Amino acid sequence: MRLRLIAVGSRMPKWVEEGWHEYAKRLPAELSLELVEIPLNTRGKNADVARFIRQEGEAMLAKVGPNERIVTLEVHGKPWSTEQLAVELDRWRLDSRTVNFMVGGPEGLAPEVCARADQRWSLSALTLPHPLVRILIGEQLYRAWTVLSGHPYHK
């Protein structure tokens, strides 16, 4: 089963890349964790932000196959505990479809992306920096896997 983080933004600091890769490599081969970066449109003073969000959303959805699962990361999504995420991860493994976690740009996700969501997940009611969100998602997916496999990392 493939897990993919499709995120708007690229050229992250080295510590973000290192953190992401650390958790991605810890997962077993049958649970591959991939990162797909969507270029962020440059926002200027008179930028058409609505158009940029729409373009970024189209680019995100173009990376998703017709039968793949979409989980959007939204402040108004459902908060999951580690144990609840482990239950979801187990369901996704049984379903065996690719799971795409969608993280929008500074203004959030395009409505078209949200409309395609199978599930909506909230990491926190706090506003989190997008570089940190990448690492959090990787770590939480790894932690959920350790819960399912009885690995001592979670304790």
Curated annotation (Swiss-Prot):
SUPFAM superfamilies reported in the protein's UniProt record: alpha/beta knot (SSF75217)
Going by the UniProt record, its keywords in alphabetical order are: Cytoplasm, Methyltransferase, rRNA processing, S-adenosyl-L-methionine, Transferase
Known EC number(s)?
2.1.1.177
Record's subcellular location = Cytoplasm
Q: Name one GO cellular component term.
A: cytoplasm
Q: Which GO terms describe its molecular function?
A: rRNA (pseudouridine-N3-)-methyltransferase activity
User: Could you tell me what reaction this enzyme catalyses?
Assistant: pseudouridine(1915) in 23S rRNA + S-adenosyl-L-methionine = N(3)-methylpseudouridine(1915) in 23S rRNA + S-adenosyl-L-homocysteine + H(+)
Identify the main location: cytoplasm
Domain of life (superkingdom): Bacteria
Q: Subunit structure of this entry? A: Homodimer.
Give the protein's function.
Specifically methylates the pseudouridine at position 1915 (m3Psi1915) in 23S rRNA.
Family the UniProt entry places it in: Belongs to the RNA methyltransferase RlmH family.
The name this protein carries in UniProt is Ribosomal RNA large subunit methyltransferase H
